[in-house]
Amino acid sequence: MQYSIKQILNNANDKLNKIGINLPELEARILLQHVTNKPIEHLLIKLNEQLSEAEIEAFEKLLERRLEHEPIAYITGIKEFYSREFIVNKHVLIPRIDTEILIDVVIGLVVSRNDLNTCSKLKSLDSVKTIQHYNILELGTGSGCIAISLLCELPNTSVIATDISVDAIKVAKSNTIKHNVTDRIQIIHSNWFEKLNKQKFDLIVSNPPYISHSEKLEMAIETINYEPHIALFAEEDGLEAYSIIAKNAKQFLKPNGKIILEIGFSQAEKVCQIFLNYGYNIDHIYQDLQSHNRVIEISPINLNRSYARRIGKSLSKMQQKLLDNELPKYLFSKEKFASEKRKIFLEIGFGMGEHFINQAKINPDTLFIGVEVYLNGVANVLKHAAQHNIMNFLLFPNNLDLILNDLPNNSLDGIYILFPDPWIKNKKKKKRILNKERLNILQNKLKNNGNLVFASDIENYFYETITLIRQNGNFEIIHNDDYLKPHDNYIITKYHQKAINENRTAKFMILQHALTGH
């Protein structure tokens, strides 16, 4: 028996509609187009055209698969992504339109379009042809749609793509042939970074599995029953992949390299925190067409470039290991600081860190921020923190002025400046931590009634600082009759002990910020 295109489509539409398919008419036409190999326009115009028995039989078989909720992309074996068709099957995740935002972001970065307020596909790529070569790593390539789209859009790029699934790699390789990019891509069977040796990349990109197992009951039948779970679900409430990437990515990035990741629409805060904890900057979060957070742009804090690596004695292997592995977890950033609810104390120039780490140990409910340019002292703090399980601190191994803009006004409960370099010679005095301009800045960072503690074993310097404080007029000196009395929980540091041995007397000035408003 023969049926017309109209009859077949109407029948299919009714069946698909009954099981809740969102666009039954469109899907029916897609299936029929796949069977007849005729354009959609033909099926719309020639509604009375009769179909052959072979075409009807083939269509019914495909329709039965769709009525079992098998995704239409798996039935046809094709899915469009970034205006190109990609081969797909049950071994790879079906490309989603939301992931196209990731492509937009990478293109924008590569062509120096860093201010992507809205993501839109680039139609003219003449400017791309003149850019520098970019070496890109994609983790978990699946069908290869991300890597191949980037290669097609950006002629001066090459890609190494990894995947743990051998079957997925077969699909990706088929797509590289389909889109003629085999000479610019290497696909490696690897679990994340395992088989990458010591290669370095300008960009690391990934759409990793990020769905929590607890969300399975909420997912569409098409997804949960047919798409590969290894590409969908992750442990740690869907965040496992981000932890793996954060832990390992730095060693594979070139200087100034970046990481571009797709994220779940409600995961931005948690993913940001993971990367902040590992010593990265969050450069930008991009939204999809539904205004959901979808793609995150990340760059590592590069200690060799961004931080003053001053070293007193040569660093031991243990110290270097602490700086490499532990310091990123405790690096100060304004993002970490923004949501802080605890009392906050800042110590400027903490030396070897004895006072700093002791204060943190005694006051576990207070956050201590330490500024110190000498990495020997930074490493010493990290060592003692690990030994005593102290975690209520952040470190800024750089010059003080570089952190001040990121400290909000009225945010600090106290500031310690203990035994700073006195810079005795007049022409060097402008280098002192406490000068007129910097004192004005620091007082604004203090809460009203917050404390500033200053100590020195150089008598002239101490009394010159008292004069500076009195000229400022916004501090009250506590215990001005007894400058020998230190503040609470003070311990004698190695430097202080050295001063005692050399017959120099340490004096302490405890100040209370007395300004009634900023």
From Swiss-Prot:
Gene3D superfamilies tied to this protein: DNA helicase RuvA subunit, C-terminal domain (1.10.8.10), Vaccinia Virus protein VP39 (3.40.50.150)
Record-linked InterPro entries: DNA_methylase_N6_adenine_CS (IPR002052), HemK-like (IPR004556), N5-glutamine_MTase (IPR050320), PrmC_N (IPR040758), RF_methyltr_PrmC (IPR019874), SAM-dependent_MTases_sf (IPR029063), Small_mtfrase_dom (IPR007848), tRNA_(Gua-N-7)_MeTrfase_Trmb (IPR003358)
Keyword Repeat: no
Ranges for region tRNA MTase: 305-518
Presence of the UniProt keyword Transmembrane in the record: no
Active site residues according to the UniProt entry: D421
CDD domains (alphabetical): AdoMet_MTases (cd02440)
Xref: SUPFAM superfamilies: S-adenosyl-L-methionine-dependent methyltransferases
Region ranges (RF MTase): 1-302
GO function term, MF aspect, one: tRNA (guanine(46)-N7)-methyltransferase activity
Pfam families attached to this UniProt entry: Methyltransf_4 (PF02390), MTS (PF05175), PrmC_N (PF17827)
Residues covered by region (HemK): 1-300
Top-level taxon of the source organism: Bacteria
Annotated residues for binding of S-adenosyl-L-methionine: G140, T141, G142, S143, G144, D163, W192, N207, E347, E372, N399, D421
Binding site for substrate: N207, P208, P209, Y210, K425, D457
Region annotated tRNA (guanine-N(7)-)-methyltransferase, chain positions: 301-518
Role description: Methylates the class 1 translation termination release factors RF1/PrfA and RF2/PrfB on the glutamine residue of the universally conserved GGQ motif.
Family classification: In the C-terminal section; belongs to the class I-like SAM-binding methyltransferase superfamily. TrmB family. In the N-terminal section; belongs to the protein N5-glutamine methyltransferase family. PrmC subfamily.
PANTHER family in the cross-refs: HEMK METHYLTRANSFERASE, MTRF1L RELEASE FACTOR GLUTAMINE METHYLTRANSFERASE
Protein name from the UniProt record: Bifunctional methyltransferase
